[in-house]
């Protein structure tokens, strides 16, 4: 019952950014791992930090599980909603907000994909070195401490992320 109440409250607050469509839910039920899919009760498409705060507050108030979803490229079932609940899709938060060539840093939203970021940075003579193999989102890479083929030379996410807004 709590899940239905939470979904109803989220729909009232976020409108059509809340989906219970079976196809959408199925897409968010798995990643690239071998684990069996588990359907979330609903998927919420966040478009701003305020949306994320709203979803977290509603899920917390109703004690409904909440699992963030980036690109679904994890090999460890990190985004799989093993207890159902809400899958919080970050793909619409995909903007590069600031680039500082002088400081060699960049501010991005969590849904920015690795290849997208490198395309933007190339125009500034910069690149993002973490390469886990998949075209993961920066949020997903930060949440898992991603590394890859360039880690020995440049470091993993934990060496390269200066700050996070949570």
Which role fits each region the language model picked out?
Residues 10, 35-66, 90-132, 146-166:
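N-terminal glycine-rich flavin-associated loop
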Residues 85, 137, 161-163:
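Broad gene-expression machinery/nucleic-acid interaction feature
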Residues 140:
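Beta-strand-loop-alpha "switch" segments that mediate conformational coupling across diverse proteins
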